[in-house]
C-alpha cells in the first residue's frame, strides 16, 4: 500500500482544487459500482481514485465531463430551440415595464366604514 500524495497527481492535474473535484467524482463512481482500473490494495475509494489519476489509468477529461454533468441543475433537452432567447428578452422587457409602472394605492381610505 503505497502512499499517494497530491504531488503525485499535480503533474497530471495542475490545479489542486480541480484534482479534489475529479478524485471525489471518481471515488463516487467507484462507490456506485464502477470498475476500478488498478488493484485496490486495501485502499479506500478516494485513495484508489487518486492512484488512478496519478497512474493515468483514467482520463481527467472524462471525469471533468462527469463533474459538470452532475452539477448541472437543468439538463438541456434535444428538442430545445434557440428562439427561447427572444422569449426571455420579451419577458425581461415586460418585467422592466411592470417594475417602472406607478404603484397602486392599496391603503384603506375614507371610503372604508370599518
From Swiss-Prot:
Lineage top rank: taxon: Bacteria
Enzymatic reactions: RNA(n) + a ribonucleoside 5'-triphosphate = RNA(n+1) + diphosphate
Coiled-coil annotated residue ranges, if any: none
GO molecular function: DNA binding; DNA-directed RNA polymerase activity
EC numbers, comma separated: 2.7.7.6
Protein keywords: DNA-directed RNA polymerase, Nucleotidyltransferase, Transcription, Transferase
Top EC group: transferase
Protein's GO biological process: DNA-templated transcription
Any single Gene Ontology cellular-component annotation: DNA-directed RNA polymerase complex
Role noted for this protein: Promotes RNA polymerase assembly. Latches the N- and C-terminal regions of the beta' subunit thereby facilitating its interaction with the beta and alpha subunits.
Matching HAMAP family: RNApol_bact_RpoZ (MF_00366)
The protein's assembly and partners: The RNAP catalytic core consists of 2 alpha, 1 beta, 1 beta' and 1 omega subunit. When a sigma factor is associated with the core the holoenzyme is formed, which can initiate transcription.
Protein family per UniProt: Belongs to the RNA polymerase subunit omega family.
Protein name, entry field: DNA-directed RNA polymerase subunit omega
Amino acid at each position: 500500500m503505497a502512499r499517494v500524495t497530491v504531488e503525485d497527481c499535480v503533474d497530471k492535474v495542475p490545479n489542486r482544487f480541480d484534482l479534489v473535484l475529479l478524485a471525489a467524482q471518481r471515488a463516487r463512481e467507484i462507490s456506485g459500482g464502477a470498475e476500478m482500473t488498478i488493484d485496490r490494495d486495501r485502499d479506500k475509494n478516494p485513495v484508489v481514485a487518486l492512484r488512478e489519476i496519478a497512474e493515468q489509468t483514467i482520463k481527467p477529461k472524462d471525469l471533468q465531463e462527469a463533474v459538470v454533468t452532475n452539477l448541472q441543475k437543468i439538463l438541456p433537452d434535444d428538442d430545445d430551440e434557440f428562439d427561447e432567447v427572444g422569449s426571455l428578452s420579451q419577458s425581461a422587457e415586460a418585467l422592466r415595464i411592470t417594475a417602472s409602472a406607478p404603484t397602486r394605492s392599496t391603503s384603506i381610505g375614507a371610503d372604508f366604514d370599518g
